[in-house]
Amino acid sequence: MALGTRNMNMNLHGESKHTFNNENVSARLGGKSIAVQKPAQRAALGNISNVVRTAQAGSKKVVKKDTRQKAMTKTKATSSLHAVVGLPVEDLPTEMRSTSPDVLDAMEVDQAIEAFSQQLIALQVEDIDKDDGDNPQLCSEYAKDIYLYLRRLEVEMMVPANYLDRQETQITGRMRLILVDWLVQVHLRFHLLQETLFLTVQLIDRFLAEHSVSKGKLQLVGVTAMFIASKYEEMYPPEINDFVYITDNAYTKAQIRQMEIAMLKGLKYKLGKPLCLHFLRRNSKAAGVDAQKHTLAKYLMEITLPEYSMVQYSPSEIAAAAIYLSMTLLDPETHSSWCPKMTHYSMYSEDHLRPIVQKIVQILLRDDSASQKYSAVKTKYGSSKFMKISGIAQLDSSLLKQIAQGSNE
Protein backbone atom coordinates (compact mmCIF):
# COMPACT_ATOMS: atom_id res chain seq x y z
CA MET A 1 0.00 0.00 0.00
CA ALA A 2 1.48 3.35 -0.99
CA LEU A 3 2.43 5.82 1.68
CA GLY A 4 -0.03 8.64 2.22
CA THR A 5 -3.41 9.32 3.69
CA ARG A 6 -6.86 9.76 2.26
CA ASN A 7 -8.45 13.02 1.31
CA MET A 8 -10.08 14.82 4.20
CA ASN A 9 -12.10 17.48 2.41
CA MET A 10 -14.05 20.17 4.21
CA ASN A 11 -16.41 22.71 2.69
CA LEU A 12 -14.61 25.86 3.63
CA HIS A 13 -16.20 28.16 1.06
CA GLY A 14 -17.49 31.21 2.85
CA GLU A 15 -16.92 32.38 6.36
CA SER A 16 -19.06 31.16 9.21
CA LYS A 17 -21.73 33.66 10.16
CA HIS A 18 -21.41 32.73 13.79
CA THR A 19 -19.08 34.78 15.87
CA PHE A 20 -16.31 32.94 17.65
CA ASN A 21 -16.80 32.97 21.38
CA ASN A 22 -14.68 31.56 24.12
CA GLU A 23 -17.25 29.08 25.37
CA ASN A 24 -18.63 28.10 21.93
CA VAL A 25 -22.06 28.03 23.57
CA SER A 26 -23.92 28.76 20.36
CA ALA A 27 -22.31 25.78 18.67
CA ARG A 28 -23.03 23.25 21.43
CA LEU A 29 -26.06 24.17 23.56
CA GLY A 30 -28.48 23.93 20.68
CA GLY A 31 -27.99 20.22 20.16
CA LYS A 32 -25.42 17.85 18.77
CA SER A 33 -26.72 17.13 15.27
CA ILE A 34 -24.98 18.77 12.33
CA ALA A 35 -26.51 19.37 8.91
CA VAL A 36 -24.40 17.74 6.25
CA GLN A 37 -23.99 17.41 2.53
CA LYS A 38 -22.63 14.09 1.34
CA PRO A 39 -19.57 14.67 -0.84
CA ALA A 40 -18.70 12.83 -4.01
CA GLN A 41 -16.78 9.56 -3.73
CA ARG A 42 -13.12 10.23 -3.11
CA ALA A 43 -10.17 8.25 -4.29
CA ALA A 44 -8.40 5.85 -1.97
CA LEU A 45 -5.03 6.57 -0.43
CA GLY A 46 -3.47 9.82 -1.46
CA ASN A 47 -2.62 12.95 0.44
CA ILE A 48 -5.02 14.70 2.79
CA SER A 49 -6.20 17.50 0.55
CA ASN A 50 -8.09 20.59 1.61
CA VAL A 51 -9.44 21.21 -1.89
CA VAL A 52 -13.21 21.46 -1.91
CA ARG A 53 -14.85 19.05 -4.36
CA THR A 54 -18.35 19.75 -5.63
CA ALA A 55 -20.85 16.91 -5.34
CA GLN A 56 -21.97 15.32 -8.59
CA ALA A 57 -25.31 16.44 -9.96
CA GLY A 58 -27.97 14.03 -8.91
CA SER A 59 -26.09 12.86 -5.85
CA LYS A 60 -28.31 12.43 -2.85
CA LYS A 61 -28.11 14.86 0.02
CA VAL A 62 -28.62 13.58 3.51
CA VAL A 63 -29.55 16.38 5.87
CA LYS A 64 -30.27 16.21 9.55
CA LYS A 65 -32.91 18.87 10.12
CA ASP A 66 -31.52 21.08 12.80
CA THR A 67 -31.51 24.79 12.05
CA ARG A 68 -29.42 25.48 15.12
CA GLN A 69 -26.22 24.22 13.50
CA LYS A 70 -24.34 25.50 10.46
CA ALA A 71 -23.99 23.02 7.61
CA MET A 72 -20.71 21.21 7.54
CA THR A 73 -19.33 18.98 4.81
CA LYS A 74 -18.11 15.58 5.90
CA THR A 75 -14.50 14.67 5.49
CA LYS A 76 -12.96 11.38 4.52
CA ALA A 77 -10.47 9.61 6.70
CA THR A 78 -8.47 6.46 6.67
CA SER A 79 -10.15 3.51 8.30
CA SER A 80 -7.54 0.94 9.24
CA LEU A 81 -6.87 0.48 12.92
CA HIS A 82 -3.89 -1.41 14.26
CA ALA A 83 -2.58 -1.89 17.75
CA VAL A 84 -0.49 0.87 19.20
CA VAL A 85 3.04 -0.32 19.79
CA GLY A 86 4.90 1.63 22.46
CA LEU A 87 8.49 2.54 21.87
CA PRO A 88 10.81 3.81 24.61
CA VAL A 89 12.02 7.36 24.27
CA GLU A 90 15.76 7.71 23.88
CA ASP A 91 17.65 9.02 26.83
CA LEU A 92 17.68 12.76 26.57
CA PRO A 93 20.77 14.89 27.33
CA THR A 94 20.55 17.24 30.28
CA GLU A 95 23.01 19.94 29.37
CA MET A 96 21.88 23.52 29.04
CA ARG A 97 20.74 24.55 25.58
CA SER A 98 20.54 27.72 23.58
CA THR A 99 18.19 26.98 20.70
CA SER A 100 19.05 23.30 20.61
CA PRO A 101 16.20 20.77 20.78
CA ASP A 102 17.61 18.76 23.68
CA VAL A 103 15.59 18.71 26.89
CA LEU A 104 16.99 20.38 29.99
CA ASP A 105 17.15 19.01 33.47
CA ALA A 106 14.49 20.68 35.63
CA MET A 107 16.99 21.61 38.35
CA GLU A 108 19.25 23.30 35.82
CA VAL A 109 16.28 25.23 34.46
CA ASP A 110 15.44 26.56 37.92
CA GLN A 111 19.02 27.61 38.53
CA ALA A 112 19.42 29.23 35.12
CA ILE A 113 16.17 31.18 35.36
CA GLU A 114 16.89 32.33 38.90
CA ALA A 115 20.39 33.51 37.97
CA PHE A 116 19.04 35.22 34.87
CA SER A 117 16.36 37.05 36.85
CA GLN A 118 18.75 38.18 39.54
CA GLN A 119 21.06 39.70 36.95
CA LEU A 120 18.23 41.78 35.53
CA ILE A 121 16.87 42.97 38.86
CA ALA A 122 19.73 45.45 38.94
CA LEU A 123 18.29 47.04 35.80
CA GLN A 124 15.23 48.10 37.81
CA VAL A 125 12.76 46.60 35.34
CA GLU A 126 9.19 47.82 35.73
CA ASP A 127 6.85 45.52 37.66
CA ILE A 128 3.97 44.90 35.25
CA ASP A 129 1.88 43.24 37.98
CA LYS A 130 1.95 46.08 40.50
CA ASP A 131 -1.43 47.54 39.46
CA ASP A 132 -3.29 44.22 39.38
CA GLY A 133 -3.63 43.67 43.11
CA ASP A 134 -7.35 44.46 43.09
CA ASN A 135 -8.10 41.80 40.48
CA PRO A 136 -7.92 38.33 42.08
CA GLN A 137 -8.17 36.63 38.67
CA LEU A 138 -4.77 37.99 37.65
CA CYS A 139 -3.01 36.51 40.71
CA SER A 140 -0.54 39.38 40.73
CA GLU A 141 1.16 38.18 43.92
CA TYR A 142 1.95 34.83 42.34
CA ALA A 143 2.27 35.72 38.64
CA LYS A 144 6.06 35.58 38.58
CA ASP A 145 6.14 32.23 40.38
CA ILE A 146 3.47 30.87 38.05
CA TYR A 147 5.48 31.70 34.94
CA LEU A 148 8.66 30.31 36.44
CA TYR A 149 6.74 27.09 37.06
CA LEU A 150 5.42 27.08 33.48
CA ARG A 151 8.96 27.46 32.16
CA ARG A 152 10.09 24.46 34.18
CA LEU A 153 7.05 22.42 33.16
CA GLU A 154 7.46 23.07 29.44
CA VAL A 155 11.03 21.79 29.61
CA GLU A 156 9.99 18.62 31.44
CA MET A 157 7.38 17.91 28.74
CA MET A 158 9.41 18.78 25.63
CA VAL A 159 9.59 16.23 22.83
CA PRO A 160 12.91 15.48 21.11
CA ALA A 161 13.64 17.27 17.86
CA ASN A 162 13.27 15.05 14.80
CA TYR A 163 11.43 12.52 16.95
CA LEU A 164 9.92 10.88 13.87
CA ASP A 165 13.42 9.97 12.71
CA ARG A 166 14.36 8.35 16.02
CA GLN A 167 12.02 5.40 15.74
CA GLU A 168 10.61 3.01 13.17
CA THR A 169 7.47 4.73 11.97
CA GLN A 170 5.64 5.35 8.73
CA ILE A 171 4.74 8.91 9.70
CA THR A 172 6.62 11.74 7.99
CA GLY A 173 6.81 15.47 8.58
CA ARG A 174 4.65 16.08 5.53
CA MET A 175 1.93 13.77 6.85
CA ARG A 176 2.00 15.69 10.11
CA LEU A 177 1.67 18.98 8.20
CA ILE A 178 -1.38 17.71 6.31
CA LEU A 179 -3.01 16.44 9.50
CA VAL A 180 -2.49 19.67 11.45
CA ASP A 181 -3.72 21.75 8.52
CA TRP A 182 -6.93 19.71 8.50
CA LEU A 183 -7.31 19.99 12.27
CA VAL A 184 -7.12 23.79 11.98
CA GLN A 185 -10.22 23.60 9.77
CA VAL A 186 -12.00 21.23 12.15
CA HIS A 187 -11.14 23.52 15.06
CA LEU A 188 -12.55 26.49 13.14
CA ARG A 189 -15.80 24.70 12.29
CA PHE A 190 -16.34 23.57 15.88
CA HIS A 191 -15.74 27.13 17.17
CA LEU A 192 -13.26 25.93 19.76
CA LEU A 193 -10.89 27.93 21.94
CA GLN A 194 -7.43 28.80 20.66
CA GLU A 195 -5.96 26.82 23.55
CA THR A 196 -7.70 23.69 22.30
CA LEU A 197 -5.88 23.80 18.96
CA PHE A 198 -2.44 24.35 20.48
CA LEU A 199 -3.03 21.62 23.07
CA THR A 200 -4.21 19.23 20.34
CA VAL A 201 -0.94 19.58 18.44
CA GLN A 202 1.06 19.22 21.66
CA LEU A 203 -0.72 15.96 22.50
CA ILE A 204 -0.13 14.59 19.01
CA ASP A 205 3.61 15.31 19.13
CA ARG A 206 4.07 13.94 22.64
CA PHE A 207 2.21 10.73 21.78
CA LEU A 208 3.97 10.16 18.46
CA ALA A 209 7.33 10.78 20.13
CA GLU A 210 6.82 7.72 22.32
CA HIS A 211 4.67 5.43 20.17
CA SER A 212 4.95 4.07 16.67
CA VAL A 213 1.74 4.73 14.76
CA SER A 214 0.84 3.52 11.29
CA LYS A 215 -0.06 6.07 8.64
CA GLY A 216 -3.56 4.60 8.47
CA LYS A 217 -4.18 5.56 12.07
CA LEU A 218 -2.64 9.04 12.07
CA GLN A 219 -5.96 10.81 11.61
CA LEU A 220 -7.45 8.76 14.44
CA VAL A 221 -4.67 10.06 16.68
CA GLY A 222 -5.44 13.59 15.48
CA VAL A 223 -9.17 13.60 16.15
CA THR A 224 -8.69 11.80 19.45
CA ALA A 225 -6.15 14.42 20.51
CA MET A 226 -8.66 17.16 19.72
CA PHE A 227 -11.36 15.20 21.56
CA ILE A 228 -9.14 15.05 24.66
CA ALA A 229 -8.05 18.69 24.33
CA SER A 230 -11.67 19.80 23.99
CA LYS A 231 -12.68 18.06 27.19
CA TYR A 232 -9.67 19.63 28.92
CA GLU A 233 -10.18 23.22 27.71
CA GLU A 234 -13.79 23.74 26.62
CA MET A 235 -16.84 24.51 28.72
CA TYR A 236 -19.05 22.77 26.15
CA PRO A 237 -16.81 20.35 24.21
CA PRO A 238 -17.97 18.56 21.06
CA GLU A 239 -19.39 15.11 21.67
CA ILE A 240 -17.73 11.96 20.43
CA ASN A 241 -20.42 11.62 17.74
CA ASP A 242 -19.23 14.91 16.26
CA PHE A 243 -15.74 13.51 15.82
CA VAL A 244 -17.09 10.30 14.30
CA TYR A 245 -19.09 12.40 11.88
CA ILE A 246 -16.26 14.77 10.92
CA THR A 247 -14.19 11.77 9.80
CA ASP A 248 -17.08 10.51 7.64
CA ASN A 249 -17.65 7.56 9.98
CA ALA A 250 -14.23 6.15 9.14
CA TYR A 251 -13.79 5.48 12.86
CA THR A 252 -16.37 4.29 15.34
CA LYS A 253 -16.99 5.65 18.80
CA ALA A 254 -15.39 2.52 20.21
CA GLN A 255 -12.22 3.10 18.19
CA ILE A 256 -11.95 6.72 19.35
CA ARG A 257 -12.47 5.65 22.95
CA GLN A 258 -9.85 2.93 22.54
CA MET A 259 -7.36 5.46 21.18
CA GLU A 260 -8.28 7.92 23.92
CA ILE A 261 -7.36 5.34 26.55
CA ALA A 262 -4.11 4.52 24.75
CA MET A 263 -3.15 8.19 24.48
CA LEU A 264 -3.99 9.04 28.08
CA LYS A 265 -1.96 6.09 29.31
CA GLY A 266 0.87 6.91 26.93
CA LEU A 267 0.91 10.52 28.16
CA LYS A 268 0.68 9.33 31.78
CA TYR A 269 -2.41 11.51 32.12
CA LYS A 270 -0.25 14.64 31.99
CA LEU A 271 -2.15 17.00 29.73
CA GLY A 272 -1.32 20.43 31.14
CA LYS A 273 1.72 21.37 29.10
CA PRO A 274 2.21 25.16 28.86
CA LEU A 275 1.13 26.61 25.54
CA CYS A 276 2.47 29.44 23.39
CA LEU A 277 -0.65 31.44 24.18
CA HIS A 278 0.14 31.46 27.90
CA PHE A 279 3.50 33.07 27.31
CA LEU A 280 2.28 35.41 24.57
CA ARG A 281 -0.22 37.04 26.91
CA ARG A 282 2.54 37.72 29.39
CA ASN A 283 4.82 39.10 26.68
CA SER A 284 2.08 41.28 25.21
CA LYS A 285 1.34 42.72 28.62
CA ALA A 286 5.00 43.49 29.22
CA ALA A 287 5.34 45.13 25.80
CA GLY A 288 2.07 47.04 26.05
CA VAL A 289 1.14 46.13 22.48
CA ASP A 290 -2.16 46.90 20.80
CA ALA A 291 -4.66 44.39 19.40
CA GLN A 292 -3.08 44.36 15.94
CA LYS A 293 0.37 43.43 17.22
CA HIS A 294 -1.08 40.79 19.53
CA THR A 295 -3.17 39.27 16.71
CA LEU A 296 -0.20 39.24 14.35
CA ALA A 297 1.85 37.46 17.02
CA LYS A 298 -0.91 34.84 17.35
CA TYR A 299 -0.85 34.32 13.59
CA LEU A 300 2.93 33.95 13.61
CA MET A 301 2.67 31.34 16.37
CA GLU A 302 -0.09 29.42 14.65
CA ILE A 303 1.73 29.11 11.32
CA THR A 304 4.44 27.21 13.20
CA LEU A 305 1.99 24.50 14.32
CA PRO A 306 2.03 22.47 11.07
CA GLU A 307 5.80 22.85 10.72
CA TYR A 308 7.63 19.76 11.95
CA SER A 309 10.92 21.68 12.06
CA MET A 310 9.51 23.98 14.77
CA VAL A 311 8.91 21.15 17.25
CA GLN A 312 12.44 21.65 18.55
CA TYR A 313 11.53 25.02 20.10
CA SER A 314 9.68 25.45 23.36
CA PRO A 315 6.35 27.31 23.54
CA SER A 316 7.96 30.20 25.41
CA GLU A 317 10.62 30.57 22.71
CA ILE A 318 8.05 30.64 19.91
CA ALA A 319 5.87 33.12 21.82
CA ALA A 320 8.80 35.46 22.44
CA ALA A 321 9.96 35.24 18.83
CA ALA A 322 6.40 35.92 17.60
CA ILE A 323 5.93 39.10 19.64
CA TYR A 324 9.44 40.23 18.72
CA LEU A 325 8.71 39.84 15.01
CA SER A 326 5.26 41.39 15.33
CA MET A 327 6.63 44.53 16.96
CA THR A 328 9.47 44.71 14.46
CA LEU A 329 7.13 44.55 11.46
CA LEU A 330 4.36 46.84 12.71
CA ASP A 331 6.51 49.37 14.52
CA PRO A 332 9.98 49.25 12.92
CA GLU A 333 10.87 52.87 13.72
CA THR A 334 10.43 52.71 17.49
CA HIS A 335 11.22 49.02 17.94
CA SER A 336 14.95 49.07 17.38
CA SER A 337 15.93 46.36 19.83
CA TRP A 338 14.69 43.84 22.36
CA CYS A 339 14.63 46.05 25.46
CA PRO A 340 15.74 44.88 28.95
CA LYS A 341 12.10 44.81 30.08
CA MET A 342 11.16 42.31 27.37
CA THR A 343 14.32 40.33 28.00
CA HIS A 344 13.38 40.10 31.66
CA TYR A 345 9.77 38.98 31.23
CA SER A 346 10.31 36.68 28.24
CA MET A 347 13.58 35.40 29.76
CA TYR A 348 15.20 35.38 26.31
CA SER A 349 17.78 37.71 24.87
CA GLU A 350 17.53 39.18 21.39
CA ASP A 351 20.47 37.06 20.21
CA HIS A 352 18.69 33.92 21.41
CA LEU A 353 15.52 34.79 19.49
CA ARG A 354 17.04 35.76 16.13
CA PRO A 355 17.42 32.19 14.74
CA ILE A 356 13.82 31.39 15.70
CA VAL A 357 12.55 34.63 14.17
CA GLN A 358 14.37 33.83 10.94
CA LYS A 359 12.72 30.40 10.77
CA ILE A 360 9.28 31.95 11.22
CA VAL A 361 10.04 34.46 8.46
CA GLN A 362 11.15 31.65 6.17
CA ILE A 363 7.78 29.97 6.71
CA LEU A 364 6.02 33.22 5.82
CA LEU A 365 8.04 33.71 2.64
CA ARG A 366 7.94 30.11 1.48
CA ASP A 367 6.18 29.78 -1.84
CA ASP A 368 6.22 26.05 -2.60
CA SER A 369 3.28 23.86 -3.53
CA ALA A 370 2.77 22.58 0.02
CA SER A 371 2.52 26.06 1.53
CA GLN A 372 -0.02 27.07 -1.12
CA LYS A 373 -2.10 23.92 -0.83
CA TYR A 374 -2.13 23.58 2.94
CA SER A 375 -2.81 27.13 4.04
CA ALA A 376 -5.69 26.79 6.50
CA VAL A 377 -4.01 29.07 9.05
CA LYS A 378 -3.45 31.83 6.49
CA THR A 379 -7.05 31.56 5.31
CA LYS A 380 -8.31 31.64 8.89
CA TYR A 381 -6.40 34.81 9.74
CA GLY A 382 -7.52 36.42 6.51
CA SER A 383 -11.02 36.84 7.93
CA SER A 384 -12.32 40.01 9.55
CA LYS A 385 -12.58 38.15 12.85
CA PHE A 386 -8.78 38.18 12.97
CA MET A 387 -8.41 41.69 11.51
CA LYS A 388 -7.39 40.17 8.14
CA ILE A 389 -3.93 40.07 9.63
CA SER A 390 -2.51 37.48 7.23
CA GLY A 391 -3.00 39.89 4.33
CA ILE A 392 -1.26 42.98 5.69
CA ALA A 393 1.41 44.57 3.52
CA GLN A 394 4.13 44.15 6.16
CA LEU A 395 4.11 40.39 5.59
CA ASP A 396 5.37 40.92 2.06
CA SER A 397 7.78 43.76 2.71
CA SER A 398 11.47 44.20 2.03
CA LEU A 399 12.03 44.33 5.80
CA LEU A 400 10.73 40.78 6.13
CA LYS A 401 13.16 39.59 3.47
CA GLN A 402 16.02 41.36 5.24
CA ILE A 403 15.12 39.58 8.48
CA ALA A 404 15.10 36.23 6.66
CA GLN A 405 18.62 36.93 5.47
CA GLY A 406 19.72 38.05 8.92
CA SER A 407 20.47 41.59 7.78
CA ASN A 408 17.85 43.64 9.59
CA GLU A 409 20.33 45.38 11.86
From Swiss-Prot:
CDD domains from the xrefs? CYCLIN_CCNB1-like_rpt1, CYCLIN_CCNB1-like_rpt2
Q: Which UniProt keywords apply?
A: Cell cycle, Cell division, Cyclin, Mitosis
Which InterPro entries does the UniProt record give? Cyclin, Cyclin-like_dom, Cyclin-like_sf, Cyclin_A/B-like, Cyclin_C-dom, Cyclin_N, Cyclins_cyclin-box
* Cell cycle listed as a keyword: yes
List the molecular function annotations (GO) for this entry. cyclin-dependent protein serine/threonine kinase regulator activity
Q: Which residues cross the membrane?
A: none
State any GO BP term from the record: cell division
UniProt keyword Isomerase, yes or no: no
Q: Which domain of life is it from?
A: Eukaryota
**Assembly:** Interacts with the CDK1 protein kinase to form a serine/threonine kinase holoenzyme complex also known as maturation promoting factor (MPF). The cyclin subunit imparts substrate specificity to the complex.
Q: What does this protein do?
A: Essential for the control of the cell cycle at the G2/M (mitosis) transition.
User: What is stated as this protein's family in its record?
Assistant: Belongs to the cyclin family. Cyclin AB subfamily.
Q: What is this protein called?
A: G2/mitotic-specific cyclin-B
Source organism of the structure? Arbacia punctulata (Punctuate sea urchin)
